[in-house]
């Protein structure tokens, strides 16, 4: 909503018929569905808005425009309507309409109406809606519109040029959103949010630059930077479907850098895919720009979203389960990286419901060519991003410090994950904090690289410690209006105990490690064993309650508080019990029968 969607022209070119796709966005309560018009992505190289459509399966080569491929490179047209797994062959994939309609019929017991269905909170009569956005009303005096480069259900996109001010005679792209199409309060709010996101995030090196927003009685105009280097999708196809490993690294680093910035600001993109990254120029070394925030949203650090939105080949399992957060973007980056390295989609099926089923149930293939020739670090990197357990995925910043991408000269950004983990550590039991400290002593260099970088970003005091003020200062130095809108700074209120104490690097390592993430690394068994042996001093492969008390420096009077963590039969804690205990699960709770 509040986005531009291109319309497919029913015509043929070079004997190949154009494919129609219809996008559906299901809202969080599960009983509203909005079909959008068929999509045609105009292949003009100068619009950042053509991927504003959240269509799960855009056709890589729409009709009506010249091929974006370099001279001498021919596209590989699909010969049938059956979707293919290999990314180097464009194809017209299916619409998710049938799958989502069937789900609604099952849920509601009735067939949903055809056409747009107003969302529950936006059922007001159109005449009662306030469509005044407060934007400038002098668009014609400031900008000159050029040719149309894309059209869709809510509006269209044009190239243009500035007529005055800092961007006089500067090429621009203008997204024009029709107010007549804003028939619900939700649609109006979506436009406000998209403009707010673009305005507050603009300025990052790898994010589309926002210039202005205007309106008149009929339309809203969003003025943005014009990128004429084409999409990442076009470059992939021009290279035969995949990138050499070193070239893929350069692309992935740019993607992770801009996504980590968005996540720190409390913004989840929700539609990361090759079509939503534009190159600034046709040069091979030109920068990437992230575009299309039409499906993006603000999110608090501990919030979970439940709207099913995005593109099917890139959607994370937890999105289909209607409970997701920033980790959903990481999954999408994993899919993009998989495609860059091998030229095929990790999750593929002939039908839309089959695509969702493979995302939920199957694992990507790492055995076929070219995976055997890929580096072990590259393969591990993709596996860490495409872990179906979102808790075990790396964050965007952690991915930048992975051995596959590590570069000591690269500046590592601040990670919001650090704040979440330290908050959990401060609220943990003394026994669990002691166990985390034991684990921290066994961390490998791969984990310590990330932790050192984050600790230094907090600006340690002269004595090498950090406190709540350090966490606050570091966060505010990176704050934008988006961060305030997403209420990210509120997490500092849950870390108040740090205002009265200091945290040195050794304890910071214990506080800033995730047990779930450690379980996904190859060295997990060695790390966990080292932590277990820190408590188990008698060499009998179990931890006694006396050993726990000695580690915590408590007397026999405190034994009663420790019995939840040991076996009731013999008062001991095994290695298996220790690993459960690291997750905060007591043995008594683990063995309790549900009533």
Curated annotation (Swiss-Prot):
Its main location: cytoplasm. Residues 111-124 have a biased composition (Basic and acidic residues). Ca(2+) 3 binds at residues 540, 547. Ca(2+) 2 binds at residues 502, 507. Not activated by calcium. Autophosphorylation may play an important role in the regulation of the kinase activity. Stimulated by magnesium ions (optimum at 10-15 mM) and manganese ions. Autophosphorylated. Residues 20-37 have a biased composition (Polar residues). InterPro entries: CDPK_Ser/Thr_kinases, EF-hand-dom_pair, EF_hand_dom, Kinase-like_dom_sf, Prot_kinase_dom, Protein_kinase_ATP_BS, Ser/Thr_kinase_AS. Optimum pH is 8. One of its GO terms (cellular component) is cytoplasm. Ubiquitously expressed with higher levels in siliques and roots, especially at the root cap. Particularly present in vascular bundles of stems and leaves. Its EC number is 2.7.11.1. Keywords: ATP-binding, Calcium, Cytoplasm, Kinase, Lipoprotein, Magnesium, Manganese, Membrane, Metal-binding, Myristate, Nucleotide-binding, Phosphoprotein, Repeat, Serine/threonine-protein kinase, Transferase. It is a lipid-anchor. It is an enzyme of class 2 (transferase). Ca(2+) 1 binds at residues 461, 463, 465. The modification Phosphoserine is found at residues 311, 353, 574. PROSITE patterns: EF_HAND_2 (PS50222), PROTEIN_KINASE_ATP (PS00107), PROTEIN_KINASE_DOM (PS50011), PROTEIN_KINASE_ST (PS00108). There are 3 contiguous domains conserved in the CDPK subfamily: a kinase domain, an autoinhibitory (junction) domain and a calmodulin-like domain. The autoinhibitory domain (409-439) inactivates kinase activity under calcium-free conditions. Belongs to the protein kinase superfamily. Ser/Thr protein kinase family. CDPK subfamily. Binds calmodulin (CaM) in a calcium-dependent manner. Interacts with GLN1-1. May play a role in signal transduction pathways that involve calcium as a second messenger. Serine/threonine kinase that phosphorylates histone H3 an GLN1-1. This is CDPK-related kinase 3.
């Amino acid at each position: 909503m509040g986005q531009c969607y291109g319309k497919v022209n029913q015509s043929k070119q070079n004997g190949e018929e154009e494919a129609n796709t219809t996008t559906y966005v299901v809202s969080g309560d599960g009983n509203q569905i909005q079909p959008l018009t068929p999509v045609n992505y105009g292949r003009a190289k100068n619009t950042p808005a053509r991927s504003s459509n959240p269509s799960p399966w855009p056709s890589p080569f729409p009709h009506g425009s010249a091929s974006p491929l370099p001279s001498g490179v021919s596209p590989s047209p699909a010969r049938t309507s059956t979707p293919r797994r290999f990314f180097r062959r464009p194809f017209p994939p299916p619409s998710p309409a049938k799958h989502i309609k069937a789900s609604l019929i099952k849920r509601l017991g009735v067939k949903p109406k055809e056409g747009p269905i107003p969302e529950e909170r936006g059922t007001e009569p159109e005449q009662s809606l306030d469509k005044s956005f407060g934007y400038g009303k002098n668009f014609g005096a400031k900008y000159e519109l050029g040719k149309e480069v894309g059209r869709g259900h809510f509006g269209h996109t044009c190239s243009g040029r500035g007529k005055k001010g800092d961007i006089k005679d500067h090429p621009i792209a203008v997204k024009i959103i029709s107010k007549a199409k804003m028939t619900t309060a939700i649609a109006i709010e979506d436009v406000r949010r998209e403009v707010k996101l673009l305005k507050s995030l603009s300025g990052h090196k790898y994010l589309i630059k926002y210039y202005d927003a205007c309106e008149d009685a009929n339309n809203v105009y969003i003025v943005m930077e014009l990128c004429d280097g084409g999409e990442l999708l076009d470059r992939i196809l021009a290279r035969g479907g995949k990138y050499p490993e070193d070239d893929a690294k350069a692309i992935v680093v740019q993607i992770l850098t801009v996504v980590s910035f968005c996540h720190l600001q409390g913004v989840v993109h929700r539609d990361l895919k090759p079509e939503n990254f534009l190159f600034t120029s046709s040069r091979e070394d030109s920068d990437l720009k992230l575009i299309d925030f039409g499906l993006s949203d603000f999110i608090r650090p501990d919030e979970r979203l439940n709207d099913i939105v995005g593109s099917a080949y890139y959607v994370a399992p937890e999105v289909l389960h209607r409970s997701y957060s920033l980790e959903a973007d990481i999954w999408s980056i994993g899919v993009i990286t998989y495609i860059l390295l091998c030229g095929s989609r990790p999750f593929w099926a002939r039908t839309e419901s089959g695509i969702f089923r493979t995302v939920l149930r199957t694992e990507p293939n790492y055995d076929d060519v070219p995976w055997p020739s890929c580096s072990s670090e590259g393969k591990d990197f993709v596996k860490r991003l495409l872990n179906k357990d979102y808790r075990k995925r790396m964050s965007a910043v952690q991915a930048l410090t992975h051995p596959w991408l590590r570069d000591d000269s690269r500046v590592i950004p601040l990670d919001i994950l650090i704040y979440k983990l330290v908050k959990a550590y401060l609220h943990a039991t003394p026994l669990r904090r002691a166990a985390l400290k034991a684990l921290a002593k066994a961390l490998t260099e791969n984990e310590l690289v990330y932790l050192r970088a984050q600790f230094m970003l907090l600006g340690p005091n002269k004595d090498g410690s950090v406190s709540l003020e350090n966490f606050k200062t570091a966060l505010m130095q990176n704050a934008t209006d988006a961060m305030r809108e997403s209420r990210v700074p509120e997490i500092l209120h849950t870390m108040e105990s740090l205002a009265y104490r200091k945290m040195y690097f050794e304890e910071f390592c214990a506080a800033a490690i995730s047990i779930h993430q450690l379980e996904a690394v190859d060295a997990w068994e060695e790390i966990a064993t080292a932590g277990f042996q820190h408590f188990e001093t008698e060499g009998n492969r179990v931890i006694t309650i006396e050993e726990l008390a000695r580690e915590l420096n408590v007397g026999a009077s405190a034994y009663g508080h420790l019995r939840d963590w040991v076996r009731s039969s013999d008062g001991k804690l095994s290695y298996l019990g220790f690993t459960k205990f690291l997750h905060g699960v007591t043995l008594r709770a683990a063995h309790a029968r549900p009533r």
